[in-house]
UniProtKB/Swiss-Prot annotation:
UniProt-listed Gene3D superfamilies: DNA polymerase family B, C-terminal domain, DNA Polymerase, chain B, domain 1, Helix hairpin bin, Palm domain of DNA polymerase, Ribonuclease H-like superfamily/Ribonuclease H
Protein name (database record): DNA polymerase catalytic subunit
Gene transcribed to yield this protein: MDV043
Upper lineage: Viruses, Duplodnaviria, Heunggongvirae, Peploviricota, Herviviricetes
General function of this protein: Replicates viral genomic DNA. The replication complex is composed of six viral proteins: the DNA polymerase, processivity factor, primase, primase-associated factor, helicase, and ssDNA-binding protein. Additionally, the polymerase contains an intrinsic ribonuclease H (RNase H) activity that specifically degrades RNA/DNA heteroduplexes or duplex DNA substrates in the 5' to 3' direction. Therefore, it can catalyze the excision of the RNA primers that initiate the synthesis of Okazaki fragments at a replication fork during viral DNA replication.
Single GO MF annotation: DNA-directed DNA polymerase activity
Subunit (UniProt): Forms a complex with the ssDNA-binding protein, the DNA polymerase processivity factor, and the alkaline exonuclease. Interacts with the helicase-primase complex composed of the primase, the helicase and the primase-associated factor; this interaction may coordinate leading and lagging strand DNA synthesis at the replication fork.
EC code: 2.7.7.7, 3.1.26.4
Protein's UniProt keywords contain DNA-binding: yes
GO biological process, one term: DNA-templated DNA replication
Locations listed in the record: Host nucleus
GO CC field: host cell nucleus
UniProt keyword list: DNA replication, DNA-binding, DNA-directed DNA polymerase, Endonuclease, Host nucleus, Hydrolase, Multifunctional enzyme, Nuclease, Nucleotidyltransferase, Transferase, Viral DNA replication
SUPFAM superfamilies: DNA/RNA polymerases, Ribonuclease H-like
Catalytic function, reaction form: DNA(n) + a 2'-deoxyribonucleoside 5'-triphosphate = DNA(n+1) + diphosphate; Endonucleolytic cleavage to 5'-phosphomonoester
């Protein structure tokens, strides 16, 4: 669709005016000064954010043309003028930095290489805080006028610069450029000399340079290296020396000679590790320059305070002139590492700013009810709300609303907003989508918030904005972070490869914390929509506005658009409250600081990288080096894996290489996570309802404590038995059988485990931090609590770090040994308890204070279950109060008698009633009244509220009603077959009453609370990646796509209900069958009518199918809102069966885990009802069957006729001989 040049566009303040339009190809805009159009290249001070435009692509809904005529459709064309916005009736050319000081808040004073700093601006400061870093490679030829000689020398012919971004104590934004960083890797000297024939470091440097030159045109990413400097790279680009180091793998590896190859460019390191004699093992070639700088310098941190000092030889720092700034910061400093002092102990935060934003979109195609898609030109962003907070004070400082067209916020909303936050929202209005998006990006650049949050912004908001600007408007975004060009501003979609677990968004100098991801981690809910999360976490509900209502509201004029604006701002307000409730920035920054990784990596890059960098730092201090992952280190002790294997932590996605780790080094197979050893031991449970006290002993930090106690590590694992010749078994090394393979680990006095050192230091640090919490003020206590939680998270990642064969530094033998020792410990505890506490006298000898709590009945003790790191001990004849008071002493006694430190048992809890079902499934009440459940269906997120409600009512009765509990204990004592033919104890009558109530509720025809019956399941990967597409939540996904509804993204939970098999449901299931496999995820604007246009079906109408044509349950899955809107009945048979199934899984322990008998017994409580099936009656009549009537009210002759028919029928049946 093109725009007629004579068309006018309506603006509420200046009325209709004619715009000069030209339909020329391409956009005419400039991204800054110093652009050489002839040679199509930029100089050293160029920028890639937009500063001037004289023509742009114009996309705007036609409903904005005239406030009286509501047109459908979208204008698409070219508009020749500068982009403008309207604020309070005034027009502003917002790219004109000088004239738009009051349009929105700004923290940027350098724009388009011009300084707008105050005349009295003082660049001096004492300390600065760093929150993000970026690595770049620059050339001396491009810095001649900018840098002093000492920095130029570090760039000849090229050099790596690490830019640290942060803020000073006095609130100035600063970028510190650290010169002289040389990333490096190692190669074993003897192997290198033998394979490549080098005789000295200089000769090796020549060979390295040759490989770089010859490889430039062969590697897939050759364009990154194709510069004149690269083609003429020489040996001077490399610094090679010989050092003494030890390989971290295996005991017996002593100091050996290694070549350390330093390069002036990290890109060369990556290229050489791939292409320089692949048979030579490279060590630490996957470590980037930022990590090198932080780990190689004591006191340096990726998140923390720094100050400057005079260099080792008296060198001083250099302040860059504003015209040479490469970032949007107020101050830029050149320095080297010897000019920096770190303050890792200072945990204070400067006044960082938080942006909380939300976007609203509308479809502009034929079907305006469709959900918008970013690649469709006509689907536009119509509003963006922006709330700006101070992270330190948690105060809302500014509120902006970017709106397409005139927008009048409701007066009551503005008054409430001002009374609550003491500010008014600023509304900025635009004529076209491009102007709105460009203004938003310009605001982002000029305000430069350090932190950004929103709800599902990674998967939708950022993704929509980035896709729209790059595909529809062909804009570069690399200059819209803190750096002015060649920065990162990118979205990674979740599910694009088998490792990535969630979407990513990374922008240089802008840390994104998506509260959707935080909510899914912190809360257990059936749905993670913002409304549900806000109610659960804040006790607040949002004002609902369906995206289907947005087109009509938008077209209705400024007042209705104001309602959309209120909705948009309200979403951001709720997200801001969630952010300061869960304060995710504190814990994640503590993890980043502890692990020595960037905050963005702590957020998006998984668990493996955290342990890897910590181990790298420690290994360096002990003279060890880490090889790039080799398949031999991931060899497994067995290819079998038990059902109850311990879950291993996910490892990092190769989609964006971690520390420049190559994808090939991560993926040795197509099997995803490879777990090649037997999992943690689980002692078989004695199922049933236990009303005697059950004490639970838990191992504190089981796997970390095993690693410490037994000195397990890469460095202590004996790979060559000849290294044991001078060592004594058991005294000098541990020998353990792991699934038939004999493994040996030397003791600490021979060589101390690096993993054990790490864990010991971390746990000591955590203990010290926790000791400070009670003495600290509330604000400091929260910070300390997040720090200790961060340490716990990293500690628990160590075992998984070793156990993932596709991980960064795998050692399956270590992980397998840990689980084997854990299994043996459970068995040892069980045998100890049965032997040492087996009689009343033995128990009282050990713990005489229990004598006052002994009951008259017979005493017994037994271990009824063992679950990885827990032991369940049942005591009969002992009062629970005595066990509670003595439990800690009992746990300490077992620990001291059986295990070396730091392994210890703790008395975690004592059950007074316990329903032990199967492995990893139990529920019970702890002394004190609190109920605890694990693995039980009623707490699963994909159960509906109806089932959860009644299952909870029944479980409450079982544990809180002593009459029911006594009756249930009686049931559990007898064999299941007894209850198949015998009446249940009367004490279970109230139990049956709840079941009858559930049945009665399902039989009510006017069910309106559909949400009570909604279930949910996660869309774990893209729909086309599912092998089985006939599953309920995927069926709903396809139905939403067919109806052009809003489509869930990967990792979203999809809600669904099971509908009755009405004609409409049958029809839609057939359409879904045709639709499957041919889904175009962005084909939203088809001619499909809105759901509201569907033909209504009477809710009493059902369709019967022959068995061969019977619908699957998954085919009857439906979107809850669609079901309610179209008056489709629920499938009551399914829900009753599902309720009974859930109850059977939970309460089968009462009947010896016999599911069939459990269901038979539970069905006794459901009232029998008769529902006449007309179609069945007609079918029977057609087969010559006759109808008879009986009962009160029949006439004498009719009753007599009935008796005669029955007499004949039963006589015939009696006379017919049995033929089988």
């Amino acid at each position: 669709m093109s725009v007629d040049g004579t068309k006018t566009f309506f603006n509420p303040y200046i009325g209709a005016r004619k715009r000069s339009l030209e339909a020329r190809n391409g956009l005419s805009f400039s991204t800054g000064q110093n652009y050489d159009e002839k040679n199509n290249r930029r100089d050293r001070n160029s920028i890639t954010y937009v500063t001037t435009i004289d023509e742009f692509k114009y996309i705007a809904p036609k409903c904005l043309d005239d406030k009286d005529v509501k047109q459908k459709g979208t204008h698409i064309g070219k508009l020749k003028r500068s982009p403008v916005l309207y604020k309070n009736g005034e027009e502003y050319v917002f790219l004109n930095f000088e004239d738009c000081e009051d349009v929105w808040p700004r923290r940027c004073s350098i724009w388009n290489n011009r300084s707008f700093l105050p005349a009295d601006f003082d660049p001096r400061f004492s300390r600065f805080h760093v929150y993000d870093m970026i690595e770049t490679v620059e050339f001396a030829s491009a810095a001649i006028d900018r840098d002093k000689n000492r920095f130029l020398e570090l760039l000849r012919p090229m050099g790596t610069i690490v830019t640290m971004m942060g803020i000073t104590e006095c609130g100035k934004r600063v970028a510190v450029h650290v010169y002289g960083i040389k990333p490096y890797f190692y190669m074993r000297k003897v192997d290198t000399d033998t394979i490549c024939g080098s005789r000295c470091p200089r000769e090796l440097a020549e060979k390295l340079a040759n490989v770089v030159r010859s490889s430039v045109n062969e590697v897939a990413n050759a364009k990154r290296f194709c510069t004149p400097v690269t083609r003429t790279v020489s040996a001077d680009c490399f610094e090679v020396d010989v050092v003494q180091r030890k390989d971290i793998y295996y005991y017996g590896t002593g100091h050996d000679e290694f070549y350390r190859v330093k390069s002036q460019s990290g890109k060369f390191i990556t290229l050489l590790c791939d292409n320089f004699y692949p048979s030579i093992i490279k060590y630490e070639g996957n470590i980037d320059a930022i990590t090198r700088m932080v780990l190689d310098n004591n006191g340096f941190s990726t998140f923390g305070w720094y100050s400057f000092k005079v260099g080792n030889n008296g060198e001083k720092v250099q302040v860059r002139a504003p015209c040479h700034h490469c970032t949007s910061c107020d101050i830029e400093i050149n320095c080297t590492v010897d000019n920096l002092i770190g303050y890792p102990e200072d945990d204070a935060w400067p006044d960082y700013k938080l942006l909380c934003f939300d976007i609203e979109c509308k479809s502009g195609g034929v079907n305006e009810c469709a959900f918008p898609c970013a690649t469709n030109e006509e689907d536009v962003v119509i509003q963006i709300s922006c709330l700006l907070y101070s992270i330190n004070t948690k105060q809302l400082e500014h509120a902006l609303l970017f709106a397409l067209g005139a927008c009048d916020l409701p007066q009551t909303f503005k008054e409430t907003f001002q009374s609550s936050y003491n500010i008014l929202p600023i509304v900025l209005e635009f004529d076209s989508e491009f102007e709105l998006l460009l203004a938003f990006m310009t605001f982002i650049k000029q305000y430069a918030p350090e932190f950004v949050t929103g709800y599902n912004i990674v998967n939708f908001d950022w993704a929509f904005i980035v896709t729209k600007l790059t595909t529809v408007y062909n804009m570069r975004l690399d200059g819209y972070g803190v750096v002015n060009q060649k920065g990162m501003f990118k979205v990674w979609d979740a599910g694009t490869n088998r490792f990535q677990k969630k979407g990513k968004f990374k922008a240089t100098g802008m840390i994104t914390l998506d509260m959707y991801s935080i909510a899914t981690e912190k809360l257990k809910l059936q749905s993670y929509k913002l409304d549900v999360v806000a109610e659960a976490a804040l006790g607040e509900r949002k004002k609902e506005l369906s995206y289907k209502e947005i087109p009509s509201h938008f077209a209705a004029g400024p007042e209705k658009r104001g309602i959309i604006g209120e909705y948009c701002l309200q979403d951001s307000l709720l997200v801001g409250k969630l952010f300061f409730k869960y304060i995710p920035h504190l814990e994640l920054s503590a993890i980043a600081k502890l692990a020595g990784i960037l905050l963005s990596k702590a957020i998006f890059d998984g668990q493996q990288i955290r342990v890897y960098t910590c181990l790298l730092r420690l290994a360096r201090s002990h003279g060890f080096i880490l090889p790039e992952k080799n398949k031999k280190f991931a060899e497994t002790v067995s290819l079998t894996c038990e059902e109850d294997q311990t879950e291993i932590c996910e490892h990092d996605s190769p989609q964006e290489p971690i520390h420049n780790i190559k994808q090939s080094s991560l993926c040795h197979s197509n099997s995803g996570r490879t777990i090649g050893y037997q999992g943690a031991k689980v002692l078989d449970p004695i199922s049933g309802f236990h009303v005697d006290p059950v004490m639970v002993f838990d191992f504190a930090s089981l796997y970390p404590s095993i690693i410490q106690a037994h000195n397990l590590c890469f460095t202590t694992l004996v790979h060559d038995d000849t290294n044991l010749s001078n060592l004594r078994p058991q005294d000098d090394y541990l020998e353990i059988n792991v699934q038939g393979k004999l493994l040996r680990f030397v003791k600490p006095h021979i060589r101390e485990s690096l993993l054990a050192i790490l864990l010991k230091d971390w746990l000591a640090m955590r203990k010290a931090i926790r000791a400070k919490i009670p003495e600290s003020c509330d604000e400091i206590a929260v910070l300390l609590d997040k720090q200790q939680a961060a340490i716990k998270v990293v500690c628990n990642s160590v075992y998984g770090f070793c156990g993932v064969s596709n991980g960064l530094l795998p050692c399956i033998d270590v992980a397998a040994t840990v689980t084997t020792i854990g299994r043996n410990m459970l068995l040892t505890v069980r045998d100890y308890i049965h032997k040492q506490w087996g009689t009343r006298d033995a128990l009282l000898r050990e713990f005489p204070n229990l004598s006052n709590f002994m009951r008259p009945e017979d005493y017994s003790v037994s271990v009824i279950y063992g679950d990885t790191d827990s032991v369940f001990i049942k005591f009969k004849g002992v009062d629970i109060h005595g066990l509670v008071t003595t439990g800690d002493d009992m746990a300490k006694r077992v620990s001291s008698d059986l295990f070396p430190k730091p392994i210890k048992l703790e008395c975690e809890k004592t059950f007074n009633k316990l329903l032990l079902i199967t492995k990893k499934k139990y529920m019970g009440t702890i002394h004190g009244g609190r109920m605890l459940m694990k693995g039980v269906d009623i707490v699963r997120k994909n159960n509906c509220r109806f089932i959860n409600t009644y299952a909870k009512k029944l479980s409450d009765l079982l544990f809180l009603d002593d009459t029911v509990a006594k009756a249930a204990a009686t049931v559990a004592e007898k064999p299941p077959s007894f209850w198949a033919t015998s009446p249940l104890p009367e004490g279970l009558n109230s139990f049956g009453g709840v079941l009858a109530e559930a049945y009665t509720r399902m039989m009510i025809n006017n069910i309106t609370e559909v949400e009570d019956f909604a279930m949910s399941a996660e869309l774990s990967r893209p729909p086309d990646a599912y092998t089985n597409k006939r599953i309920p939540h995927l069926t709903v996904y396809y139905k939403l796509a067919m109806r052009s509804e809003q489509l869930p993204v990967v990792k979203d939970r999809i809600s669904y209900v099971i509908a009755a098999a009405t004609p409409e449901v049958v029809r839609d299931s057939a359409r879904v069958a045709e639709f499957r496999g041919e889904l175009d995820l962005c084909h939203q604007n088809s001619n499909t009518s809105c759901p509201g246009d569907s033909v209504m079906t009477n809710k009493e109408t059902y369709v019967r199918h022959s068995p061969r044509n019977k619908l699957l349950i998954s085919d009857m899955a439906e979107d809850p809102k669609y079901l309610l809107a179209n008056n489709i009945p629920l499938n009551t048979d399914y829900y009753l069966s599902h309720l009974l199934g859930t109850l059977c899984v939970t309460f089968k322990a009462l009947f010896g885990n016999d599911v069939k008998i459990t269901e038979t017994v539970l069905r006794r409580f459901i009232p029998e009802t008769f529902t006449e099936d007309c179609s069945y009656t007609e079918r029977v009549s057609s087969e010559m069957f006759t109808t008879i009537r009986s009962g009160i009210g029949l006439q004498v002759n009719e009753e007599e006729e009935t008796r005669r028919k029955l007499n004949i029928a039963f006589r015939i049946l009696t006379a017919t001989p049995h033929r089988y």
